[in-house]
C-alpha cells in the first residue's frame, strides 16, 4: 500500500521546484494535497498533478489567510494530517549590503511563515492526537555560507523552532521534523535554468559530485510525513549529497579528482 494513503496534506510554496515535487510525490503515495503558493502558477501545477491536488493562493506571512486555508481543507476533507512548511525565499547579500528591510522580508517568509503555519494547524492536530509537520530548513541552517546572512539566519530559526515544537507537540501525538536540503536544482537556486550538466561540472568538491533533482529531496518529505517515521521527533534529515559532511584535501588519498581553492588542498609540511 502507498505510504500516504488516506492522508490529507498542505504543502506551501508548491507552485514549482521542491514544493511541486513534494506535492506530486505525496499524491503518488496516496495523499490528498492542498498546494499553496503566492505565485499564480500553483493553479497550473495542481491541475497537472491531478484531481487529488487543489490549489490555493497564499502569502504565508498572512495569518488570516492561513486560518482560511486550514479551515477550508478541514471542511472539505475532514482533517489535516500533514503540514509541509516549504515556502521560502533566497537572498544573496553580505552583512554590509543587507538592509534591515531585506532581513525582515526573508525572515518573515522563511521563519515567521513557518511559525504561523505550525501555530495554525497545531490545535487541530492536537485535538486528533495525530499529525506530522515537516519544516523545510536548509543545509545553510546547519553550516552556513557567506552572503547568506538573512537566509541562513532564517533557516537556523526554522531548525530551532522545529526542535521546540517537537518537544511541545510530541506528547500530544504530533511529530515535528525538519529537512535540510542542499544543492537541489530548483528555480530558486538556478533561476537562469542552467543545464544540469553545466551545474554538475562545478560540484567536484563534495561527495555526490552533482546537483540533485527536486524529487530526491521530496522523497525525504514523504518519509517524514508517513508512518514509517513514527519515532522521528525533532529529527534533522539532511539531503545534500554530503555537501556539509566535511571537506576534501586534494592530493591526498580518498579525495576525488578535481580542483579547489588552495584552502582545500593538502597541507604542506
Where would I find each of the regions flagged by the language model?
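Alpha-helical segment proximal to the catalytic Tyr-Lys
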Residues: 123, 167-171, 230
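Active-site loop immediately N-terminal to the catalytic Tyr-X3-Lys motif
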Residues: 96, 143-149, 171, 209, ...
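Substrate-binding pocket helix/loop in short-chain dehydrogenase/reductase
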Residues: 94-95, 102-104, 202
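Residue(s) in the substrate-gating loop at a strand-loop-helix junction
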Residues: 138
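C-terminal helical subdomain
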Residues: 178, 197-232, 239-241, 266-269
